[in-house]
Amino acid sequence: MRLIENWFSERYSDNLQLSFRVQDQLLSVKTDYQRIDLFNTYDFGKLLSIDGTVQLTEKDEYIYHEMITMVPYYCTAKSDSALIIGGGDGGAAKRLIDLGIKRIVNVEIDQNVVEISRKYFPELADSFNNKNVELIIGDGIKYVKDTDESFDLIIIDSTDPVGPAEGLFNKSFYENARARLSDDGIIVTQSGSPYYQPEALKMATKGMLDVFSNVRTYIAFIPTYPSGLWSFTMASKSEIMQRKDNIIPGRYFNEDVLKGSFYLPEFVKNIIKSI
């Protein structure tokens, strides 16, 4: 991360970065787990960065949060309960509430993410006050290993597979998660930019393929993430089928997006085939 002459830049490589002109920096804090920065930008409103990478902005957060929740929701036979690992901003929980999920457990490792989101992104973090949401501050990997509860959806709303999130992308975690899924349940994770982070997509896909027989990747356009092309990878013990019931659109998500998001560019298919 760089902040030079009122520009915040996320570096993708030594030769490439995406820069946002900022009005001011609202905070910078080093927690026990990560560095959190918050900026007020001209074009995207408030921007939350963790360890130098963009996590969300006011202007486009809805795309990521709709796609990580609504796609798996409409690919399950039923969705009465959900577990979110990460998601300390509350955006994923908010979408699941809107979808009518009756029980949502949200496990976030860093209390600071929740507190910052409550203050600066209340439209998202107010979801934690909903009666259907149980917020747990703790290690999601340990929670999945220790709990006896099963869920129809498990959503891995984490940072990239480094630091505290690294353990969310391996076979051991997926084995424990499989035991926590209902028979027709789905687990989904963000799996990075296929263009700039193919290893993240490979890591998520391989980890799931080692444990699940049904694994699918889908994509979305998120303008503030590397390249704008972002991948998500889901898995189930059962066949993954799109439901036939009435699909309620979001601001980005709709019935066409649900179908089209699974049509992958050839280079993305080749990344997956190379595993």
Swiss-Prot record:
Reaction(s) the record says it catalyses: S-adenosyl 3-(methylsulfanyl)propylamine + putrescine = S-methyl-5'-thioadenosine + spermidine + H(+)
Alphabetical keyword list: Cytoplasm, Polyamine biosynthesis, Spermidine biosynthesis, Transferase
Domain of life the protein comes from: Archaea
Quaternary structure annotation from Swiss-Prot or TrEMBL: Homodimer or homotetramer.
Residues where spermidine binds: 65, 89, 157-160
Gene Ontology MF terms in the entry: spermidine synthase activity
All copies of domain PABS, residue ranges: 5-237
One GO CC term, this protein: cytoplasm
Residues that coordinate or bind S-methyl-5'-thioadenosine: 34, 108, 139-140, 164
Database matches in CDD domains: AdoMet_MTases
Pathway: Amine and polyamine biosynthesis; spermidine biosynthesis; spermidine from putrescine: step 1/1
General function of this protein: Catalyzes the irreversible transfer of a propylamine group from the amino donor S-adenosylmethioninamine (decarboxy-AdoMet) to putrescine (1,4-diaminobutane) to yield spermidine.
Xref: Pfam families: Spermine_synt_N, Spermine_synth
GO annotation, biological process: spermidine biosynthetic process
Documented EC number(s): 2.5.1.16
Compartments it resides in: Cytoplasm
Family classification: Belongs to the spermidine/spermine synthase family.
Active site residues per record: 157
Gene3D superfamilies xrefs: Spermidine synthase, tetramerisation domain, Vaccinia Virus protein VP39
Name by which UniProt lists this protein: Polyamine aminopropyltransferase
InterPro entries reported in the protein's UniProt record: PABS (IPR030374), SAM-dependent_MTases_sf (IPR029063), Spermi_synthase (IPR001045), Spermidine_synt_N (IPR035246), Spermidine_synt_N_sf (IPR037163)
